[in-house]
């Protein structure tokens, strides 16, 4: 763990304790001063002072890193200093005051509340915002309001190039100089009704706006954003067979160990136990019966203590109420705005500060971005990754296996003890679980059947045990690539597996 990460998590956990008492007594939480009033400013902490509850008040002295004051739920955060990117991002309610300069994408994806910056801001302020108000007393960088859907941005200084590019709603009011708007925006003069509306916010701050201010709004003639291609799996593992090696089959009375224990790297205790190597999507508290009740799930809300909580833009703010109950978190990069490594780490620090120390922390993305995904897992020192086998336009699950394997080998994930899970779009069979395990993915992530989950879990457990006896292995971790065969030339070509009958990989894979 980096020093700044440790400092940030400690600050968040200390704040949780202070907020409890402060809310009861209606007190202001002061951070950055000693008991005697001497200044001890913070410096560079990331993902801190997030998820502030309603009526909370925090004053902090210092300069902060990424995602400061993000996911605000109704509190007031005053920063006596500056900050880097994504300050106030995903804010729902409340108020953020920054007394110096702020970095890129301040207020990104916010949907309510106000952000007041007494200095200047860098590029893409208010990008993709859906509501609320951002006031910048100084200047704003390039592409202010990029992709915004609603809300208001007021810049009392000048703005950089391409203001309002890609905007689909809302308005940007610029009191200083403004270059031609970007694609998707058009410019006009400010109206009297708008001046009156904005003055209600500016006058209490001792500010005003002139009649020559410019307003950027959506260009109704701009082209549409475009529809995202649908991601799917057009073929599963049908072209792959599971075969025994040289071992004899096991007797019917032989004890078996089909359990899979997922541990954080370097740990030997705790972890998450899977009776079947299957992480069930979106079941959670509805499980009933002895089999399904002990099987971990991947849920977006109401997790049990054996469930992983999937976090994306939809539940990023509200997930804070469920974090203490879950066995770990999975940050879904495929359904979050594009962020750099430091911003992703800021979100993870914010979330992981509120979970148990033993909880797992993982990332999820599609297989076509697996190299980037694994690099993040290693550089941010996370516990593993979920790789979605689907692709835009339709992909083959078998084709995902070599991509995952080669990327994992390049990053040395197996030797580091990091866990890999592959996501399919249909309830898994025993063969699917064994094939995934043999290819290096400990767990299959897949939806539950439409009916009777308990019976399905019992059938899957029984079938896996039968396969283990036939393969001659008493522990599911013993299966590997030697137990897998490509059933046809096409599958052998895309997977690098041994072609059944030929009993070796195709020549194009030799040396790889």
Language model features with spans:
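Conserved active-site and cofactor/substrate-binding residues in soluble primary-metabolism enzymes
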Residues: 14, 53, 67, 72, ...
